[in-house]
C-alpha cells in the first residue's frame, strides 16, 4: 500500500484498465513470440545441417520456415487468450485468481527460455559458419585441386605462358615498357620449334592475379609459366624473370639481369634462349631473332614504339591519332624501322574506317598505302609485313583474294603466331571457306584461349553456316570474357532474327554498345516486328542516318525483309563505294547468302573478283531468312 495521500498505479490491474501494449506485456505475448522465433531459427539451422546427412531434399528447410511463418499468428493468438496458472493452462477470461507472484515467476521462466533458445541458435550458427563451412570449403578446394591437376595432366609439357612482367619502376606510366617487354618475349618464344606459346591477350588476363600457378596453367592450358618484374631507372634496367611449373609453382629456372638500358634486346634474347634450354627444346635458328626491334638499336625509338602501340590500343580517335604521332616520331629517329611502318599503316586504316568519312577517310587510306609500301620494301620476308599487307588489301582495297594470299604467306613464315593464324582464319572466312576458317579459329583459340575477338570471329563463321546454337554458345563465351566487346549483342540479334524470336532480338539490340552496330541491330530487330509500320519506320530512319556510310548494312536489312531487288541495289552501291564491310561479310552473311542461287549474286561475285562460296545452304535456309 502506498503512503497516505499518494495514488499507487498498478500495471497488473484489470485488463480493461490497460492499454494494448501494456496488455501484450502483461499476457507475456512478447516473450512467447520471442521464444517461438528463436525456436524456429534454431530448428531450421539444425534441419539445414542434418539434411545432407540423411540426403533430404533442399526444400525441407524452406517449407519448414514457411509453415512456421504461417503458424506464427496462431501462436500469438494462443498466448493472448491463454495463460499459465498454478492449476495449468486457462483462458485469460476464466482466471480470476490474479496471483501476481506466480505471474511474475512465469515471466522469469519465459525469459530463461528465450535466453536458452537464442544461445542454442547462436551455437548452431557458429558451428555452421566456422566448422561446417570450413569443412565444405576444404572439400570443395580438394575437388577443385583434383580437377585442376587432371586438366594439367592433359597439357603438353613443352608449353608456356608469359604473364605480364610487373612494373616496379617509380613511374607507373612506365607500364607500357614492361608490357612491351612481355609482349616481345612472347613473340620471341613463338620462334622456338615445338613450343606451345599462349598469346598475349590471354596471358595478360592474369595481370596481378591472385590465382595459383595451377589455376592459371589450367585456364591457359600450359605446363609452365614465365613471370617476373622490370625496374627501369635512368639508363639502367633490371629484369628479374623465372620459369615455373604450373602444377606446383616450383622454379625451373630464374635469373636477374641488371644491365644498361641499351642492352635490353640482348636481355630478351638471353631469356628466350634460357627458356628453350630449360625445356630442352631446339631453336629454329642459332638464336632467337627479335625482328620487331629497331635495326639501328635506338632505345628511344623502341620506347616510343612501345608507348605508341599501347596508346593506339585504347581504341578512341584521340588515342589512334596520338599513336600515329608517336610512330612518326619513331620513324624520324629510325627511318628503316619496318615494324613501325606497319604499325603506322594499320593505325591509319583503323582511323579511316572507324572515325573518318569522305576525303578525310581517303587521305588516311593513302597514308596507309604509303606506309605499307615502305614496310614491304624494308622487310619483305617478315611475317608481320604480310599480315599488314593483307589487312590493307582486305579493308581498303576490297581485295579479299589478294589478302588471303598475304595471310597464307604470313602464316607460313610464323606458324605459331596467333595473330597470323587469326588473320588467316579471317581471310578464309571472307572468301566463304567457312569450314577451314572454323577449324583454324579453333586452333587459334588453343593458343590464345581467352582472346575475345577470336570467339567473335568464330561466331560469325558459324552464323554463315547457319549453326545457330553453336554460334550462340560461342558468342556467350565471348560475352563472359568481355561483356562490352563490340558486336557480340549484334550477333545475338542476328541469331534471334534467324530464329524468328522478336522478343530476344529486341532485348539484345538494346544491349549493343557499338554506335554503328547498335543502330543496325535495332533496325534489324524491328524487321521481324509484327507491327510493319514500325519495321518500315526503322528501315527509313536507318537509311536516312547511315545509308551514305553503311550501304552494305542497308542491303542486309533488305535481305532480312526478303526484298532481294532492293538488297542487290544496295549491294551494288556498297561495292561501288568500296564499303569495307562488303568484302568482309558478302560470303558469310546468312541473310545475303539466302539469295546465293540468284543469278545476280553470281554476277556480283564476278564483278568483285571473289569466288562463289564453297558451302551451300539447306533448302530451308536458301528460301530466305
For each predicted feature, which ranges?
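Long, low-complexity intrinsically disordered segments that are proline/alanine-rich
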Residues: 2, 6, 141-147, 622-623
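An N-terminal, helix-rich hydrophobic module
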Residues: 2-135, 250
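Alpha-helix N-cap/N′ positions at the starts of helices
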Residues: 15, 299-307, 367, 518, ...
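Acidic-histidine catalytic/liganding microenvironments
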Residues: 27, 192, 334, 589-592, ...
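Acidic, proline/glycine-rich low-complexity intrinsically disordered segments
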Residues: 50-53, 106, 111-492, 496, ...
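Phosphate/oxyanion-binding loops and surfaces in catalytic or ligand/nucleic-acid-binding neighborhoods
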Residues: 70-73, 80-87, 192, 246, ...
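Alpha-helical protein-protein interaction modules
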Residues: 387, 402-408, 418-424, 428-625
Amino acid at each position: 500500500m502506498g503512503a497516505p495521500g499518494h495514488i499507487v498505479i498498478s500495471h497488473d490491474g484489470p485488463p480493461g484498465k490497460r492499454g494494448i501494449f501494456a496488455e501484450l506485456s502483461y499476457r507475456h505475448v512478447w516473450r512467447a513470440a520471442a521464444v517461438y522465433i528463436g525456436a524456429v531459427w534454431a530448428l531450421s539451422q539444425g534441419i539445414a545441417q542434418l539434411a545432407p546427412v540423411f540426403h533430404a531434399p533442399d526444400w525441407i528447410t524452406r517449407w519448414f520456415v514457411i509453415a512456421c511463418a504461417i503458424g506464427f499468428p496462431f501462436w500469438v493468438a494462443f498466448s493472448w487468450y491463454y495463460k499459465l496458472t498454478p492449476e495449468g493452462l486457462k483462458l485469460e477470461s476464466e482466471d480470476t485468481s490474479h496471483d501476481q507472484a506466480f505471474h511474475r515467476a512465469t515471466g522469469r521462466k519465459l525469459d530463461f527460455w528465450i535466453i536458452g533458445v537464442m544461445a542454442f541458435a547462436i551455437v548452431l550458427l557458429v558451428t555452421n559458419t566456422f566448422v561446417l563451412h570450413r569443412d565444405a570449403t576444404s572439400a570443395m578446394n580438394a575437388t577443385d585441386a583434383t580437377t585442376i591437376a587432371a586438366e594439367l595432366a592433359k597439357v603438353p609439357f613443352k608449353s608456356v605462358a608469359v604473364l605480364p612482367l610487373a612494373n616496379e619502376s617509380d613511374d607507373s606510366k612506365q607500364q607500357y615498357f614492361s608490357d612491351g617487354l612481355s609482349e616481345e618475349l612472347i613473340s620471341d618464344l613463338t620462334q622456338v620449334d615445338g613450343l606451345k606459346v599462349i598469346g598475349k591477350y590471354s596471358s595478360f588476363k592474369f595481370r596481378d592475379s591472385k590465382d595459383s600457378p595451377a589455376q592459371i596453367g589450367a585456364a591457359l592450358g600450359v605446363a609452365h609459366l614465365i613471370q617476373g618484374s622490370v625496374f627501369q631507372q635512368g639508363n639502367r634496367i633490371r629484369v628479374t624473370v623465372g620459369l615455373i611449373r604450373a602444377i606446383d609453382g616450383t622454379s625451373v629456372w630464374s635469373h636477374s639481369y641488371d644491365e644498361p638500358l641499351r642492352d635490353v634486346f640482348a636481355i630478351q634474347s638471353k631469356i628466350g634462349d634460357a627458356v628453350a634450354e630449360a625445356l630442352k627444346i631446339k631453336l629454329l635458328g642459332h638464336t632467337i631473332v627479335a625482328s620487331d626491334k629497331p635495326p639501328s638499336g635506338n632505345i628511344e625509338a623502341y620506347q616510343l614504339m612501345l608507348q605508341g602501340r599501347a596508346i593506339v590500343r585504347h581504341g578512341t580517335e584521340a588515342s589512334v591519332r596520338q599513336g600515329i604521332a608517336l610512330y612518326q616520331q619513331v620513324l624520324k629517329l629510325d627511318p628503316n624501322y619496318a615494324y613501325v611502318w606497319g604499325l603506322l599503316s594499320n593505325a591509319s586504316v583503323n582511323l579511316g574506317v572507324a572515325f573518318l568519312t569522305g576525303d578525310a577517310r581517303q587521305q588516311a587510306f593513302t597514308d596507309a598505302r604509303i606506309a605499307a609500301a615502305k614496310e614491304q620494301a624494308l622487310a619483305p620476308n617478315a611475317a608481320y609485313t604480310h599480315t599488314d599487307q593483307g589487312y590493307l588489301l582486305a579493308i581498303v582495297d576490297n581485295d579479299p583474294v589478294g589478302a588471303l594470299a598475304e595471310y597464307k604467306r604470313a602464316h607460313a613464315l610464323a606458324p605459331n603466331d596467333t595473330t597470323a593464324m587469326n588473320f588467316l582464319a579471317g581471310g578464309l572466312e571472307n572468301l566463304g571457306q567457312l569450314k577451314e576458317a572454323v577449324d583454324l579459329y579453333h586452333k587459334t583459340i588453343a593458343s590464345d584461349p581467352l582472346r575475345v575477338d577470336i570467339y567473335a570471329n568464330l561466331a560469325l563463321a558459324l552464323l554463315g553456316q547457319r549453326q545457330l546454337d553453336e554460334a550462340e554458345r560461342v558468342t556467350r563465351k565471348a560475352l563472359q570474357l568481355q561483356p562490352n566487346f563490340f558486336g557480340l549483342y549484334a550477333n545475338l540479334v542476328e541469331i534471334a532474327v534467324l530464329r524468328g524470336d522478336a522478343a530476344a532480338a529486341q532485348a539484345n539490340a538494346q544491349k549493343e554498345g557499338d554506335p554503328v552496330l547498335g543502330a543496325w541491330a535495332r533496325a534489324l530487330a524491328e524487321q521481324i516486328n509484327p507491327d510493319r509500320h514500325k519495321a518500315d519506320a526503322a528501315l527509313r530512319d536507318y537509311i536516312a542516318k547511315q545509308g551514305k556510310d553503311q550501304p552494305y548494312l542497308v542491303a542486309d536489312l533488305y535481305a532480312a525483309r526478303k526484298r532481294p531487288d532492293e538488297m542487290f541495289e544496295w549491294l551494288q552501291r556498297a561495292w561501288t563505294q568500296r564499303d569495307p564491310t562488303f568484302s568482309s561479310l558478302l560470303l558469310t552473311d546468312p541473310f545475303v547468302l539466302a539469295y546465293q542461287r540468284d543469278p545476280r549474286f553470281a554476277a556480283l561475285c564476278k564483278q568483285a573478283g571473289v569466288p562463289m562460296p564453297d558451302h551451300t545452304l539447306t533448302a530451308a535456309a536458301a528460301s530466305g531468312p
